[in-house]
Amino acid sequence: MNTAKAQLGKPYVYGAAGPDSFDCSGLTMYAWRAGGVGLPHSAEMQYNAIAHISVSQLQPGDLIFYGTPIHHVGIYVGGGQMIEAPYTGAVVRYASIYRSDMVGAGRP
């Protein structure tokens, strides 16, 4: 969690995985790598690589996935919030997890 929080305000760059810029899966990959867990650099591949949990089971650090096909992932921080690298022109930020295109959640 601390690794993800330390990236707040850094720019979104498609294909980037830190340390100066990130895309969504690059951010989750970078944060979990700091905790000793390897993840692929693709939201869909991350979803397929980890154990799925229900939204009611979310704990800080869990991943939340969006889109069909899956194209976005964020890191749950608690209180219905996540840290995400959202899109070109934006920065790593806090956002609500509640979106109509939520697919599921997982725990690496």
List each language-model region with its residue ranges.
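Peptidoglycan cell-wall recognition and remodeling modules
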Residues: M1-P108
